[in-house]
Amino acid sequence: GFAHVGMPGGIGAYKNDGTLKDNAKVIYVWADNAKAVTTDVVTNNKGGKTTGVGMQNIIYLYQKGYDTTPMAFRIIGTIKKENMDELGSSSEGLQIKGKGAFSDMPITIEGIGIDAAISGFGMLVRGTKGVELRNFSVQLCIDDCISLDTDNSNVWIHNMDFFYGNTGGDADQAKGDGTVDLKAGTTHVTMSY
């Protein structure tokens, strides 16, 4: 699909042949450890590392733009809003944001098993290149299930289930705003099932 245009090495943490990219990190996340998962992330131009604690905090550290190590977050079971260390976007939920427009963010968030889900929040993806979301459901999102908002490219969303969201402010938002929202310069996106 279009997500793979100009990406011969693959999308997210995976090569095009479906195997993990060299040196990829894999973090298993479930309700009881979403606030406590850890990994070291390069956070300055001298190679200095900071230990990220919690799923959102680890992604925040990637936003600095110094670490492009492929990262696979593997969701097991249902992770609810209250299980998260924090949410980067109060209007959407988990935030994956690049340092600037189309920043290389080789991150995959994937579900493991038939019950993998996030509940009570969605995801905001902004200013990224190479993000993959797959194999989990989004339930009771704040606004959109997935918002690709501003300057994203080469994003692959597949094998996902989207359910009703929270009631929005407009008359047509009784069961949430939307499922996947693409805005403002987002290009080369593949959504498939």
Residue ranges and their predicted role:
Residues L148, N159-Y193:
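Active-site cradle of extracellular carbohydrate-active enzymes
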Residues I75-K81:
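Generic short beta-strand segments
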Residues K80, I114, I118, L133, ...:
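Beta-rich extracellular carbohydrate-active architectures
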Residues G1-A72:
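Acidic Gly/Asp/Thr-rich repetitive segments characteristic of extracellular carbohydrate-active
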Residues K35, K81-E82:
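Flexible, glycine-rich phosphate/dinucleotide-binding loops
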Residues V42-A72, M84-T108, A116-R134, Q139-N152, ...:
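Extracellular beta-strand-rich solenoid/capping regions of secreted or surface-exposed proteins
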